[in-house]
Curated annotation (Swiss-Prot):
It comes from Sinorhizobium fredii (strain NBRC 101917 / NGR234). This is Uncharacterized aminotransferase y4uB. The modification N6-(pyridoxal phosphate)lysine is found at K290. Keywords: Aminotransferase, Plasmid, Pyridoxal phosphate, Transferase. It is an enzyme of class 2 (transferase). CDD domains: OAT_like. The keyword Transferase applies. The keyword Kinase does not apply. PROSITE patterns: AA_TRANSFER_CLASS_3. GO terms for molecular function: pyridoxal phosphate binding; transaminase activity.
Length: 467
């Protein structure tokens, strides 16, 4: 199909309110023209001008099975022809929904019981908050409502989930965070550790800080702790050694529920089916989205543990119906898409590929970047990784933010045919390619990234920056 690029660009600029975009710069043309993405195959996309790009970020960590999977498209089409929609209120269901729910309960870590569906990770975390509050009301603990998140954690950008997100620019001018949401310290050893402090010692200190926060707030006022197994948007930061063991001990001590936000790490990204399995996490509630349908259809799920669900069911005679749900909860097309995606994940062992190819990817990142004078840390797990740039490597000092080093490297990579994300916190280049990525494609990604980094290093030297 041939499109009129100028016409589409004008329509887009005149009518689309783009997320996370400087609105005045976009409206006046100061930002680049809209990128009109037309097609995708494997780990590559193509724009309307014919430019091919390796998508080193799987859209937004989500196109795990790669682009152009006909088996998923066909599953969506079959379901749309057969039954495009019916709701799941009042005990209505479809075969695809029941099959998907059974699969999720069986594959999820811990003792899970039920699955509630939404359309995005943000709304799924809104559901988790309501479940925590509902659960504690039914237990006769009406004050046990505060939810603790982490600085630099990302859990969405709606009202409650945006409050959970621990980055101030998601709150500024939006009247967030809500008072029920608190934030504890980020578990990033590179920046947060005291001199000589080991990872285990640092983890113990972070756990002690959480314990102190709960004691200060009052254990009868704290209902849940929400966290990603691996910090995602906050910098693609795996937890330090001993972190999850120490954190879970604090939560059990104070009868605080653990919500594992697996929106990014679910369905193979770390090399395990769930990040919780990778790190020995035993959650009470699990949030999934993105990889659930590989973004072929919007669908999210809040997976509810037995402990929580039993309280909800036991309280039903007293409080009546579970009064929460969306028009599109359990959408049959979304369920069909998810089942087709999970078939691919299991048949092609994508967690295993993330483990094997991801190990190669991590090794290549360290080999090519760890010793560069502007690189402070190379980190990651499975098929997610990050390079963090610093102005003074020896003394761990950041670049002047006005230099926008991370954004410049991201642009230089894009100019060379690679999408790698400038992460919003610090000068960080992030990677999260589709889980179908091969070692040969890793070589392409790393080679393009290396050229981009070195080109920006040359620019900095020309501008008089001492490296």
């Amino acid at each position: 199909m041939t499109i009129d690029i100028k016409d589409i660009s004008e329509k887009d600029r005149n009518t689309v309110l783009h997320p996370f975009t400087q609105l005045k710069d976009f409206a006046t043309g100061k930002l680049r023209e809209p990128t009109i993405v037309e097609t995708g195959k494997g780990i590559r996309i193509q724009d309307a001008r014919g430019n091919q790009l390796i998508d080193g970020f799987a859209g937004l960590y989500c196109v795990n099975v790669g682009y152009g999977r006909t088996e998923v498209a066909e599953a969506i089409s079959r379901q749309a022809y057969r039954l495009a929609y019916y709701h799941s209120y009042a005990a209505h269901t479809t075969d695809e929904l029941a099959i998907l729910s059974d699969r999720l309960v069986k594959m999820a870590p811990g003792k899970m019981s039920k699955v509630f569906y939404g359309m995005s990770g943000s709304d799924a975390n809104e559901t988790q908050a309501k479940l925590v509050w509902y659960y504690n009301n039914l237990r006769g603990k009406p004050t046990k409502k505060k939810i603790i998140s982490r600085e630099r954690g990302y859990h969405g950008c709606s009202v409650v989930s945006g409050s959970m997100t621990g980055m101030s620019f998601y709150h500024d001018h939006m009247d967030l965070p809500l008072p029920q949401i608190c934030h504890t310290g980020v578990p990033h050893h590179y920046w947060g550790a005291n001199p000589g402090e080991t990872e285990r010692e640092f983890s113990a200190r972070r756990a002690a800080e959480l314990d102190e926060m709960i004691e200060t707030l009052g254990p009868d006022n704290v209902g849940a702790f929400i966290a990603e197994p691996v910090l995602g948007t906050g910098g693609i930061t795996p937890p330090p050694e001993g972190y999850w063991e120490a954190i879970q001990a604090v939560l059990k001590k104070h009868d605080v529920l653990l919500i594992a936000d697996e929106v990014i790490t679910g369905f193979g990204r770390t090399g395990s089916m769930f990040g919780s399995q990778h790190y020995g996490i035993e959650p009470d509630l699990i949030t999934v989205a993105k990889g659930l349908t590989s973004a072929y259809f919007p669908l999210s799920a809040s997976i509810v543990g037995e402990k929580v669900y039993k309280v909800l069911e036991d309280g039903a005679d007293r409080v009546g119906a579970f009064s929460h749900g969306y028009t599109y909860s359990g959408h049959p097309i979304g369920a069909a898409a998810a089942n087709a995606v999970l078939d691919i994940v299991e048949k092609e062992d994508l967690p295993g590929n993330a483990r094997e190819v991801g190990g190669y990817f991590q090794a290549q990142l360290k080999e090519k970047f760890a010793q560069l004078p502007i690189v402070g840390e190379v980190r990651g797990v499975g098929l997610m990784g990050a390079i963090e740039f610093v102005g003074d490597r020896e003394n761990k000092k950041r670049f002047d933010p006005l230099l926008k080093v991370g954004a410049r490297v991201s642009k230089a990579a894009r100019d060379r045919g690679l999408i790698a994300r400038a992460m919003p916190h610090g000068d960080i280049l992030g990677f999260a390619p589709p889980l179908v990525t091969t070692k040969e494609e890793v070589d392409e990604i790393v080679a393009m990234a290396e050229k981009a980094v070195r080109s920006v290093m040359d620019e900095l030297v020309r501008d008089g920056q001492k490296l």
